Amino acid sequence: MGLLSQGSPLSWEETQRHADHVRRHGILQFLHIYHAVKDRHKDVLKWGDEVEYMLVSFDHENRKVQLLLNGGDVLETLQEKGERTNPNHPTLWRPEYGSYMIEGTPGQPYGGTMSEFNTVEDNMRKRRKEATSVLGEHQALCTITSFPRLGCPGFTLPEHRPNPEEGGASKSLFFPDEAINKHPRFGTLTRNIRHRRGEKVVINVPIFKDKNTPSPFVETFPEDEEASKASKPDHIYMDAMGFGMGNCCLQVTFQACSISEARYLYDQLATICPIVMALSAASPFYRGYVSDIDCRWGVISASVDDRTREERGLEPLKNNRFKISKSRYDSIDSYLSKCGEKYNDIDLTIDTEIYEQLLEEGIDHLLAQHVAHLFIRDPLTLFEEKIHLDDANESDHFENIQSTNWQTMRFKPPPPNSDIGWRVEFRPMEVQLTDFENSAYVVFVVLLTRVILSYKLDFLIPLSKVDENMKVAQERDAVLQGMFYFRKDICKGGNAVVDGCSKAQTSSEPSAEEYTLMSIDTIINGKEGVFPGLIPILNSYLENMEVDVDTRCSILNYLKLIKKRASGELMTVARWMREFIANHPDYKQDSVITDEINYSLILKCNQIANELCECPELLGSGFRKAKYSGGKSDPSD
């Protein structure tokens, strides 16, 4: 989760005093990197995935499942057995926000050959097996986007009570600080977001109105005035960073061959973010209730929203410099490539001094405004040992701001003095239950980048329409019910990367004729006379590539999953979870997920993930049986 400096974290007041210093030197660090590597070309295609995991403990006797707060110990063991013993170990493990979470990546990035697609799932299996092997009896490693009873009494093991007093990090009514990773970054981030905002974060998620759900659904918090004011009728109220950052996701990072290719990919993939988010929907439950949304994006956005009342436009600007329209965790606000310029129709708040400085240093308008927009934010954490740095050889101040702008896409300059190239990170996906599904989504996105670059595809539409798509993508059953703005003719491009922009795009104004509302089925699978479909385009690309039979078979299986999720033939994880709850004998059609229901659901998820049972409505009936079977949590053990 971004920069993980070690050391002594400063208080919020001290961090604030150094904010201008961090921004000033962050920009100098960016300029050093930019001037050193702006002309670097021919970096090879490399890419890698990041999977976030939750650790759970099953109490089979009492039919209860809890989040296991020993991520630190598990991580230490995995790193000791892995990368510290063998630098070429096939897996890497990193901390995540929750003390019940860990993050796993391949040990080395994947390369540009087609056969690499056949190794993704094997590596994910290795990770699952490796982490499972260090767990105790009745414990399991799960890839679940949101734990349904996160924030309910007794949801952690060991159990801890929330402490809503001022001294803590969250001050939450529901989420104990013990559930936050012990690394100083995470608790400090939590505390400083709250201090900067001037109040606790506010998350209100619409409740799903079932037959017996109270109407209006109202929760009362007589002991907490802040919560009483912030909670809304017919909504599930949450009050801590952990409700967002304590969820799991799936991300992919690509290295481009040059800065211009990275900027082109950043823009093109930004339009795909809402589509893939809806396709990967996997988080319908919050704080023990069934919600009316399927994705975590809005929850996580609100959970780290550090904007003050002035910045949110609720009071006139007096102590702050800017009115800011979005949380620092949200969709991108500007395209970076020349082709995207005319589609930049969102008002962009920038630090004009930084913008002018960047222009004077030879940075073009589009990149300068992107960086000047990121730098309207304050640093949220600062370590005493990291205040005075060598700007020519270090980038911690730049990364401090960059890594706490959590957007759908991230444009990543190389670290100083490294052979790493310009990268882009694709960030909107929800994590899936199985390694097969997670591999399918990763391979789909990576293949799409190959096709975008090979065929010079153009998905650009006005950025305001992408934002509208992001809102639709989070709605319940968006994959089947939602309509999304999408470009009609995606094949007009000339040599988009080399020329910076295709001939077809030289007109200064975008035309409403260029895009229309489409279903995800149309976007993914195509519709005659309307749109060719992304999967038919990927298939045509594959037909022209040298691919061995085994790899081709794997890729086709992955694409079949995406195709069938888009058409509705297979369910999203969110829809499958809703059906599971609705059909549970203990469910009272009141939108409440009890310990018993939660236990049954997570147990089933774990069995599916470890291939101890089939789930044709989620994976398809022909889902191939694999040799690996892990997990130590089945009650039949």
From Swiss-Prot:
Residues bearing PTM Phosphoserine: 5, 8
Subunit structure: Heterodimer of a catalytic heavy chain and a regulatory light chain.
Function noted in UniProt: Catalyzes the ATP-dependent ligation of L-glutamate and L-cysteine and participates in the first and rate-limiting step in glutathione biosynthesis.
SUPFAM superfamilies: Glutamine synthetase/guanido kinase
EC number from the UniProt entry: 6.3.2.2
One GO CC annotation: mitochondrion
Protein name from the UniProt record: Glutamate--cysteine ligase catalytic subunit
Description of activity control: Feedback inhibition by glutathione.
Example GO molecular function: ATP binding
Tissue: Most abundant in kidney. Also found in liver and testis.
Pathway assigned to this chain's UniProt record: Sulfur metabolism; glutathione biosynthesis; glutathione from L-cysteine and L-glutamate: step 1/2
UniProt similarity note: Belongs to the glutamate--cysteine ligase type 3 family.
Gene name linked to the record: Gclc
